[in-house]
Design a protein with these regions (language model features):
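A short amphipathic helical element positioned immediately N-terminal to and/or at the very start
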Residues: 15-20, 72-85, 369-388
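Juxtamembrane inter-helical linkers in multi-pass membrane proteins
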Residues: 59-69, 74, 212, 220-223, ...
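Juxtamembrane helix-boundary/capping and inter-helix hinge elements in multi-pass membrane proteins
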Residues: 122-125, 204-209, 219-222, 260-263, ...
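Membrane-water interface segments at the C-terminal ends of transmembrane alpha-helices
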Residues: 26-65, 84-204, 232-252, 257, ...
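Alpha-helical residues within the helix-turn-helix
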Residues: 215, 273, 506
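Transmembrane helix boundary and interhelical loop/hinge segments in multi-pass membrane proteins
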Residues: 72-73, 199-212, 221, 234, ...
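Transmembrane alpha-helical segments of polytopic membrane transport and secretion proteins
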Residues: 1-34, 302-340, 431, 592-605
Length: 605
């Protein structure tokens, strides 16, 4: 009996040892489990927390009402939707958000379609360069266009230096300087490159044989576009429409900069105001509404794309599309395209740069130009150091590089690990769970996701300390927000590498980490670099995601520019935005160099 028990114990330990050795040799399952645990906490827990906050009594309200902290309540839902202040904090901002989103999306979609058609399909002058130049506004921080507009059209309604037009004796009316009109225009000019890229890509993929056949049967250009090309662009048009609406609804900078002076509130700025007033229950409800709107728009987009997948063109690729000759319209259309570039990309840079180089607005004498706002020497009416010597700017610059850099590296590595687990564990629950949960942050606008993180990490929960006010929280929220892009990139990259190289390494006795570092890492080097640089670019110009999470000492360049604007230091804000623009441009050039392509490759020329 004793021998039998001893033998069974030995066989158990031998079996356990074999399983552990297999797990160490091929720990894909273990990696998948660890990723499931980490992402469950970083993605699902904040969402659960914000839903909980929307129906839980806060400590302050509990003290005022005689209830218990955390007690179930519909108070905040009622406050947002039916109370005496609901018009101010929700219904009017919702109406304003819909109005601005409608006009901004309409302008962006129209500009994107027209310019994409001109660059990809016509002999417009400079089409080779316009393909890249027209997407520059997409690389700039969201507040660049708004601050440039403010610098140009600002009037005496708000304090600070004169606007450029006002310095020439022209006082812009309030409706032109602030409110729905400038917000809609600035949003449209910021987001039309998104439409331009999608339409350009769609147009380049349309089989040219369809147009050739129509031309053979005598169809005119107008008929070809109305009967063939535009119907084929319907899925792209719907995607542009829905995704642009989602982006405009979640944008904070432009409504804050141009809406606050006119007391024109959108949902994003109403959410921010609730955060500043420490009304966490209302914050939770508004954030949930924004998230549900984003989810609804995305589901509609998916439905439209799937529906229109039935209408595909079948056949070989025709000859390369030859640019249509515009004839007498070539010069007018060329002027139009270059004017859009001037207004949307070059214009803001010029306005921002001029404002930082002129000691007095509107004085174009040579003696008025200099680096006073950059050095802080002989600056009229400003008690702040210059950009080069400002402790706030230097700290914000360091924080931006530290936070965006750390987040991008973690995001890139995490994306490849998710890709590895998903591809190497096909058909498993772990694979399906990781694929879906890593995409979940895409459904939430930046402000709403930041509010979710604020609700989760504002206080200590078990072994996890309170992270609010720390750089760690900003890094975490950036990592999780950009994870959908990194994970999709990682999955795509890993699907291109079969298991054979790893199996060969195992035969030669290489351990798991040796196979990762010596086999997979070199094969995925380019994918990893791209997965790091793209989140870094986005992180450097991020504002909506971090504006409610930063505290003194953790300011980024984007939030510091907003602080300067709040205190009336327009020139310092503009200089800070220029620094962001330069860093982003350099990062894009590095990305182009690494990938040996560019964001507008194939669009023209």
């Amino acid at each position: 009996m004793f021998t039998s028990n001893s033998t069974s114990q030995n066989s158990f330990f031998v079996s356990l040892k074999i399983k552990l050795s297999k797990l160490l040799l091929q720990p894909t399952f273990l990696i998948g489990v660890v990723l499931v645990i980490i992402l469950s906490y970083l993605v699902i827990a904040p969402i659960v927390s914000i839903f909980s906050n929307s129906v839980s009594l806060t400590m302050m309200d509990a003290m005022l009402s005689g209830g218990k902290d955390g007690e179930f309540t519909y108070k905040y839902v009622d406050r947002v939707f039916t109370s005496s202040i609901s018009e101010k904090i929700f219904w009017i901002p919702l109406k304003n958000s819909i109005t601005v989103s409608f006009f901004a999306t309409l302008i962006a979609l129209t500009l994107g379609l027209i310019l994409a058609s001109l660059v990809t399909s016509t002999n417009i002058l400079g089409r080779k360069y316009l393909g890249f130049l027209l997407i520059i506004p997409y690389m700039l921080p969201s507040q660049a266009m708004a601050t440039a507009w403010l610098t140009m059209f600002k009037n005496r309604k708000i304090s600070g230096p004169q606007g450029m037009l006002e310095s020439f004796g022209i006082t812009p009316p309030d409706w032109l300087a602030y409110g729905p009109l400038p917000i809609s225009i600035c949003m449209a000019l910021s987001y039309f490159p998104f439409a331009f890229l999608l339409f350009s890509s769609a147009l380049s993929k349309i089989d040219i044989q369809l147009e050739e056949v129509a031309s053979t049967f005598g169809a005119k250009t107008k008929a070809i576009w109305s009967k063939i090309i535009l119907p084929l662009l319907i899925p792209t048009t719907m995607s542009v429409l829905l995704l642009t609406v989602a982006r405009t609804l979640g944008t904070f900078a432009t409504p804050y900069i141009l809406g606050t002076p006119a007391k024109y509130t959108l949902l994003s700025t109403s959410l921010y105001s609730s955060v500043r007033s420490n009304d966490s229950g209302v914050v939770a409800v508004i954030a949930i509404v924004l998230s549900l709107i984003g989810l609804m728009l995305l589901l509609v987009d998916i439905w439209v794309v799937r529906k229109w997948q039935r209408f595909v063109t079948v056949g070989g690729k025709g000859i390369k599309r030859q640019p249509s000759k515009l004839g007498v319209f070539r010069m007018p259309t060329t002027i139009f395209a270059w004017i859009i570039f001037l207004i949307a990309a070059l214009g803001p840079f010029i306005v921002l740069a001029l404002s930082t180089l002129m000691r007095e607005p509107g004085n174009f004498s040579f003696s008025n130009f200099g680096l006073a706002y950059w050095t802080g020497v002989n600056v009229p009416g400003m008690d702040q150091p210059g950009i080069f010597t400002s402790p706030e700017v230097i700290t914000a610059l360091k924080n931006s590089f530290l936070i965006a850099g750390s987040a991008s590296i973690i995001c890139g590595v995490l994306g490849l690990l998710i890709g590895y687990a998903v591809v190497r564990l096909p058909g498993t629950l772990i694979s399906g769970f990781l694929r879906q949960i890593s995409f979940l942050p895409y459904l939430m606008p930046g402000l709403a996701f930041a509010a979710a993180y604020l609700s989760l990490f504002a206080v200590a929960r078990g072994p996890i300390p309170a992270l609010y006010g720390s750089i760690s929280l900003l890094i975490l929220v950036m990592v999780v927000t950009y994870l959908p892009y990194a994970s999709r990139s990682g999955i795509s990259a890993m699907m291109q590498v079969g298991p054979e190289p790893e199996e060969a390494g195992m035969v030669l006795g290489a351990g798991f980490w040796r196979r990762i570092t010596s086999i997979l890492a070199p094969l995925q080097k380019s994918a990893l670099i791209i997965a790091i640089i793209l989140p870094f670019i986005t992180g450097m110009k991020e504002l909506s995601l971090v504006v409610m999470l930063v505290t003194p000492g953790t300011e980024l360049l984007t939030t510091q520019s907003i602080r300067f604007l709040d205190f009336g230091y327009t020139q310092l804000a503009n200089a800070t935005i220029l620094i962001i623009g330069v860093v982003v441009m350099i990062s894009v050039l590095i990305l182009n160099r690494v990938t040996k392509t560019n964001l507008a490759s194939g669009l023209g020329g």
